[in-house]
């Protein structure tokens, strides 16, 4: 009789052990749900980074244009801004799409097409007041018979602050001192323009 009682005790204990095991299994099922909020948090982080990229400063673009058929006695004025007729992509394009802009860098390449016997120099001057009508300084120059490049920074062209897209930033005046109308060459000009506040 006592041995039968022991077997019955084992049977009663059996289901209790099974319930303990099943309880552990239910805890395991809950664990994958804990990773859910972490994945959502990572997605929010990526979204925040993308919002920081698109700000009110707009975009920066590089434009390249040329001034052709320069002669050994040529002179003229290039107006950098909405009156830059030599670069319609800027004056008639991007500046009509933004309220404010600034030119931060200018590279002026004089590409000579003159013969080795052509005498003279091509002088250029930057006018940030946009008021000069004639060359007043002969510091920056190119030899007509040789190709060369000059680069001007934002400080030299008044390009540190944004301005209205209806206002020119600076002029570049040029004048060759040759005595003939022989072919001199061309300017190839590269400018970097930052735009702000789309229209």
Swiss-Prot record:
Chief place of localization: virion
Q: What UniProt keywords apply to this chain's record, in alphabetical order? A: Capsid protein, T=3 icosahedral capsid protein, Virion
Q: Which InterPro entries match?
A: Luteo_coat
Tree of life domain: Viruses
The answer to whether keyword Ribonucleoprotein applies is: no
Pfam families attached to this UniProt entry? Luteo_coat
Basic residues bias (residue ranges): 7-21, 36-46
rRNA processing as UniProt keyword: no
Annotated phenotype, changing residue 134 to T: In strain: Isolate MAV-PS1
User: For the region Disordered, what residue ranges are annotated?
Assistant: 1-21, 33-52
* Location in or out of the cell: Virion
Which cellular component terms (GO) are annotated to the entry? T=3 icosahedral viral capsid
GO MF terms listed in the record are: structural molecule activity
Q: What does this protein do?
A: Major capsid protein.
The record makes one more remark, namely: The N-terminal region like those of many plant virus capsid proteins is highly basic. It has been suggested that these regions may be involved in protein-RNA interaction.
- Family statement: Belongs to the luteoviruses capsid protein family.
Descriptive protein name: Major capsid protein
Species this protein is from: Barley yellow dwarf virus (isolate MAV)
């Amino acid at each position: 009789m006592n041995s039968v009682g022991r077997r019955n005790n084992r049977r009663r204990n059996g289901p209790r052990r099974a319930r303990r095991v099943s309880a552990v299994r239910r805890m395991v099922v809950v664990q994958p749900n804990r990773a859910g909020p972490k994945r959502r948090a990572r997605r929010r982080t990526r979204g925040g980074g993308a919002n920081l990229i698109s700000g009110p400063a707009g975009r920066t673009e590089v434009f390249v244009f040329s001034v052709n058929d320069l002669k050994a006695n040529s002179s003229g004025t290039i107006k950098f801004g909405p009156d830059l007729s030599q670069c319609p992509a800027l004056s008639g394009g991007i500046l009509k799409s933004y309220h404010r802009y600034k030119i931060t860098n200018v590279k002026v390449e004089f590409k000579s097409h003159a013969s080795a016997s052509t005498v003279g120099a091509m002088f250029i001057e930057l006018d940030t007041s946009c008021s000069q009508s004639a060359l007043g300084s002969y510091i920056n120059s190119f030899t007509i018979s040789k190709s060369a490049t000059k680069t001007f920074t934002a400080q030299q062209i008044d390009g540190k602050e944004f301005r209205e897209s209806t206002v020119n930033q600076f002029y570049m005046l040029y004048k060759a001192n040759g005595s003939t109308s022989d072919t001199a060459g061309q300017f190839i000009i590269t400018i970097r323009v930052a735009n702000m506040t789309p229209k």
